[in-house]
Design a protein with these regions (language model features):
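Conserved phosphate/anionic-ligand binding catalytic regions in large, soluble enzymes, centered on
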Residues: 27-29, 126-144, 339-364, 445-465, ...
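Flexible, glycine/charged-enriched surface loops at secondary-structure junctions
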Residues: 102-113, 148-150, 217-235, 266, ...
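Alpha/propeptide regions of enzymes that mature by internal proteolysis
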Residues: 2, 9-12, 26, 53, ...
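Extended amphipathic alpha-helical scaffolds
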Residues: 1-44, 50, 233-380, 563-577, ...
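Glycine-rich, flexible beta-strand/loop modules in the N-terminal catalytic cores of phosphate-handling
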Residues: 25-113, 119-126, 185, 192, ...
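Long, charged amphipathic helices and adjacent flexible linkers at domain junctions
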Residues: 228-231, 235-242, 542-568, 614-636
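Single-stranded RNA-binding regions, centering on S1/OB-family and related RNA-binding modules
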Residues: 561-563, 572-731
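Mobile "lid/hinge" segments at catalytic clefts and subdomain interfaces of large enzymes
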Residues: 144-263, 460-556
Length: 731
C-alpha cells in the first residue's frame, strides 16, 4: 500500500512516500521536491559479536539517467563515488549516527546497518542532497530499526539580506550563504555551510529560520510513521554495570585527574593507559600462563572498558570544574607559529602553520586553464579553478596504517577548508590562474582542518594570490552536564572525543566563510549557539593577528617558476585567424614561442609561458594576426600569388589583398609577372575594401604615382577576358 504525505514549503510541494518500492527493506521512502526525487532504503543484517564500534554504512549515488545524461568517459556506467557523492554521504551520516540508542549501537551483538540513497530524478533547480537527508530519516522512522528521530534537513540561502528557504541553483549563485541544517523537533543537530563573510548574528538568524522549516519536515515524518510505521524492534537492555563502575570511581577517579594533567598529548595518553592497566591488574589480575581465570574476579575486559569510560568522564568533570588537560582556560588558544616560504620556490607558495601539537604543511601550485578540474555531475559540466586537498597520514598521530588514497574524512575536511578560502579568492578576470593547495597534516591533536585553513591562507599569500582578506579557522567544543556548560576554544583531540559538540568556524575579520557543526547530544539552544559563535570570533581574530606576523599581505609577484600570463581581447570573429586551418596557425605560434594559448568564445586570449619573453612574442604575433588593415596606410607586403588581373599581397599575417593590374604602375601593364614575382616584398597602400569586405591595394599609390583610382586602362583589343576582371577582388 502506497502512503504519502505532502506539504508546501517555500512555494513548492515536498512529498514523502513509502510502500511502493523496496518492500523487503526494513524501511524505504521516496522524497520529491519539484521534479527532484530521491529514494532511500535502510536495512539491518544479523548481529555480530565482538564489534567495538557501530557499523553504520551510508551510501549515496547519483544516477545520470536522473538528469537524462550518460556517464562521461569510456565506460558508460557509474563507477567509484564522486566527490559530491562522498560529501553527501557525510551530510546524511553525521546527523543520523548519534540518533541510534546505545542499546542498539553498544550492544555486545551489534548489527550492520546500511542506508542506501539514490537520486532518481533531478530538475536542475533543487539539489538532491538535502532531500536524501530527509529521505534517510523518513526511512528510518517508518522502519523497525530503533531511531531517536525523525530529523529534518533544509538548505538556506541569503540574497540581499533576505533568507531564502530551499534556494534554487540559480539563487545560490547570487547567495552570500549556502547553509545546510539538520535537526529534530527540539534542536539543531548539524550545520554545514560556505559563506561570503556573513556576520555571526545573521548566521544565527539563518539557522533559526532553518529550524522552523525542520519542524515542519519532522511533523510530516511523524505523520507518515503514525500511518504505516513498523513496530520498533525490541532490544535487550545493556548490562547494568553501574555498581562496578561506582566502586571503580570511588577508588580510582582522582587518579585519572592527575594523569590527565600530564603535559603533552602522547605523554598524557601513555600515562592514562598505564594507569588503566595498573588499575585493571589490581582489580582483576591476569592469570599466570596456563592457569584458569579466577571466576570470582570481575571480567578483565569489562574492567578495562569501565576504566576507559571513567577516564573520559574524568576529563569532562575536569573541564566543567574550569581546568583543561593542557592547563588552558576555556578561551585560550594554543601557541601559534606561522612561517611562509618554507619550501624552495619551485613550489609556487608554501607555509607551515603550527598550533600547539597540530601542524599543517601547505604547498600551492599555480597552473593554467588546462589544469582546471572538470566536474561532470547531474548538472551542466563545469570547471573548478580552485581546489584544496587535505591529507591525514598515519605518522601525524604517531600511528601506522596503509595509505590507500583519501578517505571520506579527508575529502570532507578538504572541502571544508576549500569552502573557507574559496569565498576570498580573486575573480578569474583579476587572477586567471588555476590554484591548487595541498595541506599535509604533519602533526595532529585536534583542529587539523582549521590548521589547513590558516596554512592555506598563508600559502596563497606567499604564492602571490591576491586574496581579498586573510582567513583563519578555529575548532570549538562544548561540554554540557545539566546546567553546567563549558564552551571551549581551540579544542584538543581528546576534547573533541569526549565533548558534546564539534564546532568549526572559519572566516575573515569581517565575517564567516565556512562553518561545520556536529552535536552528539539532543541539541543546542540558539542562545548557546550564538555564544559559541561569538567566542569563536574572538579566537579567530587572535589567530589572524598571529598569522599576519608571518606575512601581512599577498606578495607582489608570483614565483619565477610559476607560469607567466598575458591576457588580451580580440574580435571574436577573428578567432579563426589565430587558430588557422586545422589549428595550423596556433600550433605554429605555440611552437615558435614556447607558450600555451587558450582562446575563449568571447575573444579573451590567454597566453601562458614560463618565459615572459616568449609570452610577449606570442602576443605580438596574435596582435599582428588580428590587426585591422587601415585605409590610406602604406604596408610592406609580400606577393603570394600572381594572376592575369593583378597580384595578391599579404600585408598582415593571414590577411591578403588584391593589387589590380591597373594599380601596379602608371601606364599600361601587359604582364603582371614583368613587374612582380612571388615572394617579392613591395610597398602597397590600402585603398579600403569592396562591398564584400575584400581588401583593395595599390602599388602605384604607395610609390606616389597616380591617385590609386585605376586611371590607366589597356586598349580594348588587348583587354584580358580571363578571370572576370576586377570582380574577383581580394580574398
Amino acid at each position: 500500500m502506497t502512503v504519502k504525505v505532502e506539504k508546501e514549503i517555500a512555494g513548492r510541494t515536498l512529498t514523502i512516500e513509502t510502500g511502493r518500492v523496496a518492500r523487503q527493506a526494513n524501511g524505504a521512502t521516496m522524497v520529491r521536491y519539484g521534479d527532484t526525487q530521491v529514494f532511500t532504503a535502510v536495512t539491518s543484517s544479523s548481529a555480530r559479536f565482538g564489534m567495538n564500534f557501530f557499523p553504520l554504512t551510508v551510501d549515496y549515488r547519483e544516477k545520470t539517467t536522473a538528469a537524462g545524461k550518460f556517464p562521461g568517459g569510456f565506460i558508460k556506467r557509474e563507477g567509484r563515488p564522486t566527490t559530491k557523492e562522498i560529501l553527501t554521504c557525510r551530510l546524511i551520516d553525521r546527523p543520523i549516527r548519534p540518533m541510534f540508542p546505545d542499546s542498539y549501537t553498544k550492544n555486545p551483538a551489534v548489527a550492520d546497518t546500511s542506508v542506501a540513497a539514490m537520486v532518481l530524478s533531478v530538475d536542475q533547480e533543487n539539489d538532491p542532497d538535502v532531500l536524501a537527508g530527509i529521505s534517510a530519516s523518513a526511512a528510518l522512522s517508518v522502519s523497525d530499526l530503533p531511531f531517536l528521530g525523525p530529523l529534518g534537513t533544509v538548505r538556506i540561502g541569503l540574497i540581499e539580506e533576505e533568507i531564502i528557504v530551499f534556494p534554487t541553483h540559480e539563487q545560490l549563485k547570487e547567495s552570500k550563504l549556502d547553509l545546510v541544517v539538520a535537526g529534530t523537533m527540539d534542536a539543531v543537530t548539524m550545520v554545514e555551510c560556505g559563506a561570503k563573510e556573513v556576520s555571526e548574528e545573521k548566521m544565527v538568524e539563518a539557522i533559526a529560520k532553518a529550524h522552523e522549516v525542520i519542524r515542519e519536515i519532522v511533523e510530516m515524518q511523524n505523520e507518515l510513521a503514525e500511518k504505516v510505521g513498523k513496530p520498533k524492534m525490541e532490544l535487550e537492555d545493556l548490562p547494568d554495570n553501574s555498581e562496578q563502575k561506582a566502586e571503580l570511581k570511588v577508588k580510582y577517579f582522582e587518579g585519572f585527574r592527575e594523569k590527565l594533567l600530564t603535559e603533552g598529548k602522547h605523554a598524557r595518553s601513555s600515562a592514562v593507559s598505564e594507569y588503566i592497566s595498573a588499575c585493571q591488574d589490581e582489580v582483576s589480575p591476569e592469570p599466570e600462563e596456563g592457569a584458569e581465570a579466577d571466576a570470582s574476579l570481575p571480567d578483565r575486559d569489562l574492567v578495562k572498558s569501565l576504566l576507559r569510560d571513567l577516564a573520559d568522564e574524568s576529563e569532562r568533570e575536569l573541564i566543567l570544574s574550569g581546568t583543561r588537560t593542557d592547563g588552558r582556560s576555556y578561551t585560550d588558544i594554543r601557541d601559534i607559529n606561522a612561517e611562509v616560504g618554507v619550501l624552495p620556490n619551485r613550489v609556487h607558495g608554501s607555509s607551515l602553520f603550527t598550533r600547539g601539537e597540530t601542524q599543517s604543511l601547505v604547498s600551492v601550485a599555480l597552473g593554467t586553464g588546462k589544469d582546471q578540474q572538470i566536474v561532470d555531475g547531474l548538472g551542466e559540466e563545469y570547471k573548478e579553478r580552485f581546489t584544496l586537498h587535505y591529507n591525514f597520514p598515519a605518522f601525524s598521530v604517531g600511528e601506522s596504517w596503509p595509505n590507500r588514497g583519501p578517505k571520506r574524512r579527508e575529502i570532507g575536511h578538504g572541502m571544508l577548508a576549500q569552502r573557507a578560502l574559496a569565498n576570498v579568492m580573486p575573480t578569474e578576470e583579476d587572477f586567471p590562474y588555476t590554484v591548487r593547495i595541498i595541506s599535509d597534516i604533519m602533526e595532529s591533536n585536534g583542529s587539523s582542518s582549521m590548521a589547513s585553513v590558516c596554512g592555506g591562507a598563508l600559502g596563497l599569500m606567499d604564492a602571490g594570490v591576491n586574496i581579498r582578506q586573510p582567513v583563519a579557522g578555529i575548532a570549538m567544543g562544548l561540554v554540557k552536564d545539566g546546567d553546567k556548560t563549558a564552551i571551549l576554544s581551540d579544542i584538543l583531540g581528546s576534547e573533541d572525543h569526549n565533548g558534546d559538540m564539534d564546532f568549526k568556524v572559519a572566516g575573515t575579520q569581517f565575517g564567516i566563510t565556512a562553518l561545520q557543526m556536529d552535536i552528539k547530544i539532543t541539541g543546542v539552544s540558539q542562545e548557546l549557539l550564538a555564544e559559541a559563535l561569538e567566542q569563536a570570533r574572538g579566537g579567530r581574530i587572535h589567530i589572524l593577528k598571529e598569522m599576519l606576523k608571518a606575512l601581512g599581505k599577498p606578495r607582489d609577484d608570483i614565483s619565477p617558476f610559476a607560469p607567466r600570463i598575458i591576457q588580451i581581447r580580440i574580435d571574436p570573429e577573428k578567432i579563426g585567424l589565430i587558430i588557422g586551418p586545422g589549428g595550423k596557425m596556433i600550433k605554429s605560434i605555440q611552437e615558435e614561442t614556447g607558450t600555451t594559448i587558450e582562446i575563449e568564445n568571447d575573444g579573451v586570449v590567454t597566453i601562458w609561458s614560463t618565459d615572459m619573453e616568449g609570452a610577449k612574442g606570442a602576443q605580438q604575433k596574435i596582435e599582428a594576426l588580428t590587426e585591422e588593415v587601415q585605409a590610406d596606410r602604406i604596408y610592406d607586403g609580400k606577393v603570394v600569388s600572381i594572376k592575369d588581373f593583378g597580384c595578391f599581397v599579404e600585408v598582415l599575417p593571414g590577411q591578403e589583398g588584391l593589387v589590380h593590374v591597373s594599380e601596379l604602375a602608371d601606364g599600361f601593364v601587359d604582364k603582371v609577372g614583368d613587374l612582380v614575382s612571388i615572394g617579392d616584398i613591395i610597398k602597397v597602400m590600402c585603398l579600403g575594401t569592396d562591398n564584400q569586405g575584400r581588401i583593395k591595394l595599390s602599388k602605384k599609390a604607395a610609390e606616389g604615382g597616380g591617385d590609386g583610382d585605376g586611371d590607366s586602362k589597356p586598349p580594348p583589343k588587348e583587354r584580358s577576358r580571363e578571370g572576370g576582371g576586377d570582380r574577383r577582388g581580394g580574398r
